Amino acid sequence: MTRPIVIAIDGPAASGKGTLARRLAAAFNLPYLDTGLLYRAVARRVLDRGGDPADPAASEEQARSLSRLDLERGDLRTPEVDRAASAVASIKPVRAALLDFQRRFADASGAVLDGRDIGTIVFPEADVKLFVTASLDVRAKRRHLERLAHGIDPGFDSVRAELAARDEADRTRAAAPLVQAKDALLLDTSQMDANHAFTAAADLVNKVLARG
């Protein structure tokens, strides 16, 4: 395969897809883009300006003004931004504004991208598509540990409820709902640590690429 390789990784929040995508990008020498960070950055920009993330006009304006520097902020993974990003991601004009950003990122040298609609909307022609998931309880435990590592303890039950609400919003939104692409390979990481998940994913990628 001589053209740039695109690996699309989709799945619900806290499924391990981000960690997996970063490791695959390093292993296959490809750029990496966490597309969920785009929506977080847009949400952060709206909040900073005192706007409502659910306001289509305000969120679209910030989506069209987004730069790569916005993705480097250290305050994009707070509970407030989590909730705001979910609202932003449901707005069709915002998703349209960010679509070109994502495609241009991978055009020149390929990429590993993770999100919720990479294999279905952003890169339906991706060379490899993975759908990474895990049980709600496992994902809630992972997210809770992440919060604790950042000095935040909202409680496990609160995190679990937050993820369940995010899952429902992702699955039912009109704009690019979270679904497994028909040709995506399923990887359930419920019983896997990060190393096991990476090994399994890398094997899947190599098998697909070997078929040409």
Swiss-Prot record:
GO CC annotation, single: cytoplasm
According to its UniProt record, where is this protein mainly located?
cytoplasm
Task: Give the protein name, as stated in the record.
Answer: Cytidylate kinase
Sites binding ATP sit at G11, P12, A13, A14, S15, G16, K17, G18, T19
CDD domains listed in its UniProt record: CMPK
Name the family the entry cites.
Belongs to the cytidylate kinase family. Type 1 subfamily.
Q: Which Pfam families match?
A: Cytidylate_kin
Q: Where in the cell is it found?
A: Cytoplasm
Enzyme category, top tier:
transferase
Q: Which GO terms describe its molecular function?
A: ATP binding; CMP kinase activity; dCMP kinase activity
Residue span of region Disordered: 50-69
Instruction: List the source organism.
Output: Acidiphilium cryptum (strain JF-5)
Q: What EC number(s) does this enzyme carry?
A: 2.7.4.25
